[in-house]
């Protein structure tokens, strides 16, 4: 394993926090974005982890707020000629792979993902070459180049079902890049999985000691956990699942107070789903200067109103997502396998 990229020791180029806007500035950019979306025949596709004001704007303009799987479905099926993807770069790449005829814009092309950064394609190719007998399954949180090497792409919402299916066929798996999700899936399915050792900086910061203290303070609360979290956090959960699955769990659990261990961006849609329940952030490893993400992805936070307006107004190379056509065609194969498999689960 010494030749593998080590995400635990990597120093990620964290972006600066966006400059806060005044109330008047927010109103100005909101109206400008609404006008530009109409003029550009564009629609917004926003992830649950973007800031609440971005999700609200996507709702108001007929766009989509969802996890990465539904973002992929929505963008491919929507008649708009331009997709404004509010998320991180791999989401924009995925939109372009599935909709090559459309213009894909992002507020910034520098919105990274620690899972993507932690799985460089050269190192990953060497890892796969060393294990040619294994089926390669990669999480959606990867670059187009890594997807192009894969047999399957998967999201957390269907990970257990897909690996269970492959295991039933007797296939041995390479799983990348999230080690925590890989271990969770392995434990649920019993499959033979060899994990790449990546991690999400947000979920990796949840720690049992701090969560136990919060649980003791609110003993009547249920704990909801995303499986990108460490195993010890998952073991404390009343419900484990993807973003959309956690929102569904919030509605079905009888508890009136919920401790949520995932990016706090999810609170916007979760609170809509359970307006009468109290939502509490699961504590991260540190506070202030000692935590890296503080339960909110710093790259998701780059999707601000001003940046969205500029992307729609200026377009061009600073905002438009491009994927090499040969790479796109290769990455499309495992993505379509994922979408086809997901369709069978929906019946």
From Swiss-Prot:
Q: Name one Pfam family in it.
A: NadA
Record keywords, A-Z: 4Fe-4S, Cytoplasm, Iron, Iron-sulfur, Metal-binding, Pyridine nucleotide biosynthesis, Transferase
Q: What is its main location?
A: cytoplasm
Please state the span of the N-terminal signal peptide per the UniProt entry: none
Where is it found, in Gene Ontology cellular component terms?
cytosol
What protein am I looking at? Quinolinate synthase
Per the record, the pathway is: Cofactor biosynthesis; NAD(+) biosynthesis; quinolinate from iminoaspartate: step 1/1
Give the organism the record lists: Escherichia coli O157:H7
The cofactor note reads: Binds 1 [4Fe-4S] cluster per subunit.
Whether Metal-binding counts among this entry's keywords is yes
Describe the function of this protein: Catalyzes the condensation of iminoaspartate with dihydroxyacetone phosphate to form quinolinate.
Locate the residues binding iminosuccinate. Answer: 47, 68, 139-141, 156, 226-228, 243
Binding positions for [4Fe-4S] cluster per the UniProt entry: 113, 200, 297
């Amino acid at each position: 394993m010494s030749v593998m990229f080590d995400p635990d020791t990597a120093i990620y180029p964290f972006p600066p926090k966006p400059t806060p806007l005044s109330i008047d500035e927010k109103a100005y950019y909101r109206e400008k974005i609404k006008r530009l979306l109409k003029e550009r025949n564009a629609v917004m596709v926003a992830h649950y982890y973007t800031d609440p004001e971005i999700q609200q704007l996507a709702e108001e303009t007929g766009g989509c707020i969802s996890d990465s799987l539904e973002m992929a479905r929505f963008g491919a099926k929507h008649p708009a000629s331009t997709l404004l993807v509010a998320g991180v770069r791999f989401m924009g790449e995925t939109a372009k792979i599935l909709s090559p005829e459309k213009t894909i814009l992002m507020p910034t092309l520098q919105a990274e993902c620690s899972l993507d950064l932690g799985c460089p394609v050269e190192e990953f190719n060497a890892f796969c070459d060393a294990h040619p007998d294994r089926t390669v399954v990669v999480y959606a949180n990867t670059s187009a180049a890594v997807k192009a090497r894969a047999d399957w792409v998967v999201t957390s919402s269907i990970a257990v079902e897909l690996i269970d299916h492959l295991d039933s066929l007797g296939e041995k798996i390479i799983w990348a890049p999230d080690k925590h999700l890989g271990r969770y899936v392995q434990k649920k399915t019993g499959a033979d999985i060899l994990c790449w050792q990546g991690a999400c900086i947000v979920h990796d910061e949840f720690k049992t000691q701090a969560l136990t203290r919060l649980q003791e303070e609110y003993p009547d609360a249920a704990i909801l956990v995303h499986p990108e979290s460490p195993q010890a956090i998952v073991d404390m959960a009343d419900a484990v699942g993807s973003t959309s699955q956690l929102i569904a769990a919030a509605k079905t659990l009888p508890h009136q107070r919920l401790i949520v261990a995932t990016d706090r961006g999810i609170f916007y849609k979760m609170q809509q789903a359970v307006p009468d329940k109290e939502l509490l952030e699961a504590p991260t490893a540190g506070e202030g200067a000692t935590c890296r993400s503080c339960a909110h992805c710093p790259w998701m936070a780059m999707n601000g109103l001003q940046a969205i307006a500029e992307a729609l107004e200026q377009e061009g190379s600073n905002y438009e997502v491009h994927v090499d056509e040969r790479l796109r065609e290769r990455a499309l194969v495992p993505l379509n396998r994922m979408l086809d498999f997901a369709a069978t689960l929906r019946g």
